[in-house]
């Protein structure tokens, strides 16, 4: 805002405000004639990604968004949802699993990973309970924390995330070992992904695999978002937790506000 004021730019043509009514932001928007979208007060931040908060900036085909949502609610994934949530609940309660590790093998899924981390932490981390979410960017983390995952404390559940049907990339030229000849970077990452799964199976480490189809990227990604929110809400209800609040963090907000005078 300071920059725009210094350059005498019209902020009404460059800013959009998304907020609840009758607060500092909405009053600012009204005063400066900014485009304003009212946000539902009952839709907490981490669950708002498919509202105007998450979708306004993207020119997405709404039909594909609906297809992604329907694939979870109407096409059989709902049965998997209940079954998987029940499995996770059993692991949490009976196997002393208290950590969820996301092994992300596709760089473009990292933003999802950090959102999912927030979703789990703020929804389940209450009343002395937790399912601590950790993000691992793979195969980079094969060379750091993977040793702990494989041979450390057995208190973790893992989810492998990867995109499939990616655009073909260029094969590596014959600079190195013959084994790499005519192999692309995707081929090498696929091999590392599959090798890790094989070792997890061998060591009886609990995990699941989530694959995002790049032939239908919007539908697949929306399905993943919806599935994640519903699974988390089901887990919270089974653990007698409110999935939609974050009371401990609210205390910091109140304390910060009081310190500002």
How would you name each of these model-derived features?
Residues 62, 66, 74-199, 203:
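Acidic catalytic cores of enzymes that act on phosphate-bearing nucleotides/polynucleotides
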Residues 137-138, 211-221, 248:
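Small/polar glycine-rich anion-binding or flexible loop at a beta-alpha turn
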Residues 1-77, 254, 258:
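Glycine-rich phosphate-binding loops that contact phosphosugars or nucleotide phosphates
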